Amino acid sequence: MMDSEATSARESLLTSLRDYKTIYNEERAFIPRFIELLEHPDAYQRTHLPGHITGSAWIINDDGSKVLLVKHAALHKWLQPGGHADGDENVFRVALREANEETGLTHLTQVGSSFFDIDIHSIPARKDLSFPQHDHYDVRFLFQADEKAELKISDESTDLRWIPLSDLQEFNDEKSILRLRSKLA
């Protein structure tokens, strides 16, 4: 049974999704899929397959010219910090926690009052963990941070760096990542 904070957070996300206006066709197509997933009580559990809610942080520097990305150890990709909700239905808190854990940043300022982007992406099977291919229903928040602040690479990453937005495609040219950059223009 969900507590009142969890119910409130889930309802808040559902309301935000229903009210969300985007010019991107792929995001519009994701909205009903997110809403359908959120009807399941285990949507925030990583064990819920074929997919579950995740939260991530698109962190830009103070002048908006760079983004902080991590080189994910298991996926071998440059990505924004983020991860599993593990039952926490406050997806903003999930994104903030993951940003702190994966970058060491403790002073992040949210830009905007709601999520910045949504995405559904496939995660390959992990035979070493006996985990099948599944989808991450990623709720992305925009944050700003001081690029001079000390960074700390987590065990989940092999590298961490501020990347000029103009060079982003050299690190990750996936459509959903480039969409995040285009939203800053």
Report each predicted region and the residues it spans:
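Predominantly extracellular/luminal regions of secreted and cell-surface proteins
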Residues: M2-P32, T103
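Acidic, metal-coordinating catalytic segment for phosphate/diphosphate chemistry
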Residues: D19-S56
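Short histidine-centered beta-strand/loop micro-motifs
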Residues: H48-L49, L68-V70, G83, L151-S154
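Short connector loops at helix/strand junctions that flank enzyme active sites
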Residues: P50-T54, D62, A73-L75, Q80, ...
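Glycine-rich active-site/cofactor-binding loop and its immediate structural neighborhood
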Residues: D62, V67-L96
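Unchanged
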Residues: D86-S176
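Compositionally biased, intrinsically disordered linkers/stalks adjacent to structured regions
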Residues: S182-A185
